[in-house]
Amino acid sequence: MHRYRTHTCEQLRPENVGETVRLSGWVHRKRDHGNLLFVDLRDHYGLTQVVCDVSSAVFKTLEAVRAESVVSVTGTVVARTAETANAKLPTGAIEVKAQTVEVLSQSEVLPMQVAGDQEYPEDMRLTYRFLDLRREDVHANMVLRSKVISSLRRRMTDQGFLEYQTPILTASSPEGARDFLVPSRIHPGKFYALPQAPQQFKQMLMVSGFDRYFQVAPCFRDEDSRADRSPGEFYQLDFEMSFVTQEDVFAAIEPVLVGVFEEFGGDRAVTPAPFPRIPYDEAMLKFGSDKPDLRNPLRNADVTEHFADGGFGLFSKQIALGSVVRAIPAPGAAGRPRGWYDKLNEWARESGAGGLGYVVFEEAGPKGPIAKNLEPERVEAIRQALDLKAGDSVFFACDKPLKAAKFSGLVRERICDDLGLRETGVFRFCWTVDFPMYEMNEETGQIEFSHNPFSMPQGEMEALETMDPLAIKAYQYDIVCNGIELSSGAIRNHLPEIMYKAFEIAGYPKEEVEARFGGMLRAFKFGAPPHGGSAPGIDRIVMLLADEPNIREVILFPMNGQAQDLLMQAPNTVSDKQLKELHIKLDLPKKALKVDKGEAAGDKAE
């Protein structure tokens, strides 16, 4: 017989009755019925009930062992009676009558229970992550993650992609977030950076003649935590293709995503390929976001013309100063009490807007502050434009175009949730396309890249030389599912002269571009194919499939919201010797200078 087990805790069935078996696992739960002791033994695969009576030689051993101790049990498989069988367990028709028990590892008193559904503070869960990972739902999420990654790899390989590994230590580059820097001992005063993405390397792979690349790539960004973003590191399905158009990229990744979501999404419907393509300008108008949630049936509309020079002076004055008006429909909301409208108006003010005007369409006619002041024919034109009927309402956001778009998007989501309109049990995919190449920094007045600086502008050099930069579109695109951005991608700018010009418009002189991207630019000067790609976020894919609201629920050892690893106590201080080897002297805020004995005294390090 095997030293530890003949079967897992999920394998035994009625056909095993009468066999002598050995199981090993964790003591999940104990139930003492006086003369009988029941122990649920758990391993990675499942649960098996172990039983012994008071006359058994192992009774005292099992009675004394704590929950989550690791034990090995040898015994006989017996059938449960019809009354005691547990149809919810795969092993619920049998139990193991214990003959010998070996305690392999005794557990201390638990700071948090593994069995049961009790909720614990996140800091406790992350401090004792090894216990948290034993809990059924969390454990299942990690198994799901592993299976999803395996499926992604298989599907990419089936599409003709080959997996290559790119460097983890690289050079710092301006990709939109702060870099994690690694000091060089051999080159004092110089630093490596952990890659925010394998962007330049995968493009140079295309220049090197590799046609279809992919990688389950770790990415590192020093940015704040969000529900759908873990601080520090994340993983993405990074891929790149040569000699492709935008549609070729879409056609390559859509079947991979559809396949994975159908494989692991249960009975939830998945948008079939090809996914809807929504231009950025349309997305901002209709959805108030470049990450539209298509489960929300509401569609916003521009009604500026119906308020311009009209009787509702508050809006007409703002329109004259460059503002626009967005309308957000609220079907069936006419019967809502006045308090609901007042609460929405208060919420709008708390969100930084001036308020939230509305019109209620009743059988007797339109009602509300705007309807009292705006000419009836204009109110009717708005009703027709949004295809509203008696019993519906409509809300309005008036502001400068970008602010009006973003706020109307928030209103659209709030109304959808208040009215219970969001579709459930589905994964709604779309592409957001035709992003602007540039945007204006409102604080500095400087033109900046709005998305990926390595994207090819639509119209190429002619567009850069002849068009208003803010009117130039790029071959940039995002994959969105249920309002969550899974990936950004682009057809790349592979021509050095176009790249120099694109960066010049954003305020980067040629010398700085060469200093920051010299390796890639040199590669482009020796024959670069047109190429493009994307990089769907694996953590977010698993979060959606697991139906988890927080991305940390699908990461094995995540940092908390303050970018701390509570299990490993990272970040931590290092010794004076380590700092001196790296030629680093710390200049810390006074409140951070206190260190424990034996740790680094940063103000003394050279």
Curated annotation (Swiss-Prot):
Pfam families with a match to the protein in the record:
GAD, tRNA-synt_2, tRNA_anti-codon
Region of interest (Aspartate), residue spans: 199-202
Q: Cite the entry's keywords alphabetically.
A: Aminoacyl-tRNA synthetase, ATP-binding, Cytoplasm, Ligase, Nucleotide-binding, Protein biosynthesis
CDD domains assigned to the protein according to its UniProt record, in alphabetical order? AspRS_core, EcAspRS_like_N
Mind telling me which residues the site (Important for tRNA non-discrimination) is annotated on? H33
Task: Please list the reactions this protein catalyses.
Answer: tRNA(Asx) + L-aspartate + ATP = L-aspartyl-tRNA(Asx) + AMP + diphosphate
Q: Name one GO molecular function term.
A: aspartate-tRNA ligase activity
Predominant cellular place of this UniProt entry's protein? cytoplasm
Q: Which GO terms describe its cellular component?
A: cytoplasm
GO terms (BP aspect): aspartyl-tRNA aminoacylation
> In which residues is ATP bound?
R221, D222, E223, E485, G537, I538, D539, R540
The record's annotation in InterPro entries points to: Aa-tRNA-synt_II, aa-tRNA-synth_II, aa-tRNA-synth_II/BPL/LPL, Asp-tRNA-ligase_1, Asp-tRNA-ligase_1_N, Asp/Asn-tRNA-synth_IIb, AspRS_core, GAD-like_sf
Write out the annotated subcellular location.
Cytoplasm
Subunit structure of this entry? Homodimer.
Query: What family does this chain come from, according to its entry?
Result: Belongs to the class-II aminoacyl-tRNA synthetase family. Type 1 subfamily.
Q: What's the stated role of this polypeptide?
A: Aspartyl-tRNA synthetase with relaxed tRNA specificity since it is able to aspartylate not only its cognate tRNA(Asp) but also tRNA(Asn). Reaction proceeds in two steps: L-aspartate is first activated by ATP to form Asp-AMP and then transferred to the acceptor end of tRNA(Asp/Asn).
Q: What is this protein called?
A: Aspartate--tRNA(Asp/Asn) ligase
What organism does the UniProt record list as the source?
Answer: Rhodospirillum rubrum (strain ATCC 11170 / ATH 1.1.1 / DSM 467 / LMG 4362 / NCIMB 8255 / S1)
